[in-house]
């Protein structure tokens, strides 16, 4: 039994246990087929073609024992499914990219930072993050490139918040608004990723910015419809509108209209682009010159 994709030998049929991240349906001149995206515990990923009469129907994502035919086709290795059996009791998270941060420390940093915000912003940040804390702490920011690993949303949020803190002081911006916006900037991504870190329809149809703004509005409505009159009076609708604008005025979003929104937009680009490059270079030796990768042109591993 194999567990590492790199151990598969060309020209033979072998058994291997992998995580099936997603199953795509397709149609060719020869009939219907399936394309399975699979990964092992060593962060290797492959596409497996299923041209058999056996339709892969299990609920994805799923860990399974796969019988594969491995052949060379047009200078590349081709993986074709022969059959499969789901593995009972397997832990999906064991197959996903590992975290680079301490989850508890990162979460505590956000909690402690939010305590110093003005009352309305403090309450909103606490309500939005607490309402989605489990997924917010665990999920990746995306399926590949920047922070495509466990705790990715949390890790990116902490880095963006720290940058927002220094930037607001250097540029004389509204520090509380900047910090609140930074702490909620990525929360909408929890709707854009599934448990195996695949993108969902929300990522394409709605987007993270709109998802985040909707979550802010939901918590505001809870406050306004509640019985705590003092809390209701603390709600500053101007701050709420500015927050919603900030989280939506990102790349792939609306045009920024405030200094704080512009600052967060470029800080977001800094945080995500730097991590994307670091991720792209992670598998290379120091001094390597890498041909155009991930749209960044040629890169050099320092």
Regions found by a protein language model. Give the residues of each.
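Short nucleic-acid-contacting surface segments enriched for D/E, G, S/T with interspersed K/R
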Residues: 14, 51-67
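Divalent-cation-assisted or electrostatically stabilized phosphate/pyrophosphate-binding catalytic cores
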Residues: 149, 197-217, 256, 261, ...
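OB-fold/S1-family single-stranded nucleic acid-binding modules
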Residues: 69-100
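Beta-strand/loop nucleic-acid-binding surfaces
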Residues: 33-58
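Histidine/acidic-rich helix-loop-helix segments that form or flank divalent-metal centers
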Residues: 179, 196-201, 221-286
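Structural detector for short beta-strands of small beta-barrel domains
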Residues: 11-27
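Acidic/His-rich, divalent-metal-binding segments that scaffold phosphate/diphosphate chemistry
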Residues: 90-203
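OB-fold nucleic-acid-binding modules
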Residues: 1-14
């Amino acid at each position: 039994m194999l567990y590492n994709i790199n151990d598969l030998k060309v020209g033979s049929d072998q058994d291997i246990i992998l995580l099936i991240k997603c199953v795509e349906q397709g149609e060719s001149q020869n009939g219907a087929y399936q394309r399975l995206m699979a990964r092992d515990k060593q962060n290797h990923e492959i596409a497996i073609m299923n041209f058999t009469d056996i339709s892969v129907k299990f609920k994805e994502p799923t860990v399974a024992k796969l019988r594969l035919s491995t052949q060379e086709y047009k200078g590349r290795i081709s993986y074709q499914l022969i059959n499969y059996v789901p593995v009972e009791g397997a832990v999906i998270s064991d197959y996903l990219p590992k975290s680079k941060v301490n989850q508890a420390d990162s979460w505590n940093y956000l909690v402690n930072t939010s305590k110093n915000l003005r009352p309305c912003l403090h309450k909103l940040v606490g309500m939005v993050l607490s309402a989605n804390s489990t997924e917010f702490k665990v999920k990746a920011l995306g399926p590949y490139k920047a922070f495509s690993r466990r705790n990715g949303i949390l890790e990116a949020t902490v880095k963006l918040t720290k940058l927002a803190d220094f930037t607001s002081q250097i540029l004389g911006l509204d520090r509380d608004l900047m910090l609140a916006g930074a702490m909620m900037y990525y929360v909408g991504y929890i709707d854009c990723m599934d448990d195996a870190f695949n993108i969902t329809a929300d990522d394409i149809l709605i987007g993270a910015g709109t998802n985040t703004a909707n979550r802010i509005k939901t918590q505001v409505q809870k406050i306004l419809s509640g019985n705590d009159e003092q809390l209701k009076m603390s709600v500053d609708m101007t701050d709420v509108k500015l927050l919603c604008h900030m989280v939506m005025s990102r790349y792939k979003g609306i045009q920024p209209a405030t200094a704080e929104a512009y600052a967060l937009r470029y800080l977001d680009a800094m945080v995500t682009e730097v991590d994307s490059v670091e991720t792209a270079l992670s598998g290379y030796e120091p001094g390597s010159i890498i041909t155009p990768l991930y749209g960044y042109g040629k890169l050099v591993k320092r």
